[in-house]
Amino acid sequence: MEKFNTHTGLVVPLDVANVDTDQIIPKQFLQKTERVGFGVHLFHDSRYLDHDGTQENPDFVINKPEYKGASILLAGENFGCGSSREHAPWALQEYGFKVIIASSFADIFYGNCINVGLLPIKLTEAEIEQLFKLSPNAQLTLTVDLPNNVVTCGELSFKFSLNEFQQYSLENGVDSVGWTLNKLDTIKAFEEKMPAWQ
């Protein structure tokens, strides 16, 4: 998992509420556990005109030339709802997204994003609407400053928050397993103090 500090990237606006994990990565593509090979299937049913994924839908926003190379996804409310699947953030990340911004996320999806180093940012509905209004007129670029918990766009700035563990995990590139392994000496010392079962 890579450390996250600051990131400046092009925004792709997906102005759709309640995008569920099956829309993000349909179930037929969940047949492996390695974290590779999912980006090509991201938003498959909207992104492609055919079942095989060989003919792109030119009307789907991430296929539009002006959004090629975008690394920040601006989304509608309740993003990532539906069934729990780690493959959804894997697909987003492998496609090239480093940040997802929405007014709300499904809780499990939000946690899965943190676990893989994909930064989910919650802004207010009014702030999200403001960004959506900016995005169609020009290529919108945002800078995300994780240590200071701020998103900037020119003169505009938007604060966001994470809990202490989420902040630590992303800034240090450490997931929950890695965090536990970093505390191994403390865990061993505690266990040595505990009386043995008799």
UniProtKB/Swiss-Prot annotation:
GO terms for molecular function: 3-isopropylmalate dehydratase activity. SUPFAM superfamilies: LeuD/IlvD-like. It catalyses: (2R,3S)-3-isopropylmalate = (2S)-2-isopropylmalate. Its EC number is 4.2.1.33. One of its GO terms (biological process) is L-leucine biosynthetic process. InterPro entries: 3-IsopropMal_deHydase_ssu (IPR004431), Aconitase/3IPM_dehydase_swvl (IPR015928), AconitaseA/IPMdHydase_ssu_swvl (IPR000573), IPMI_Swivel (IPR033940), LeuD (IPR050075). Keywords: Amino-acid biosynthesis, Branched-chain amino acid biosynthesis, Leucine biosynthesis, Lyase. Heterodimer of LeuC and LeuD. Belongs to the LeuD family. LeuD type 1 subfamily. PANTHER family: 3-ISOPROPYLMALATE DEHYDRATASE SMALL SUBUNIT (PTHR43345:SF5), 3-ISOPROPYLMALATE DEHYDRATASE SMALL SUBUNIT 2-RELATED-RELATED (PTHR43345). This is 3-isopropylmalate dehydratase small subunit. It comes from Colwellia psychrerythraea (strain 34H / ATCC BAA-681) (Vibrio psychroerythus). The gene is leuD.
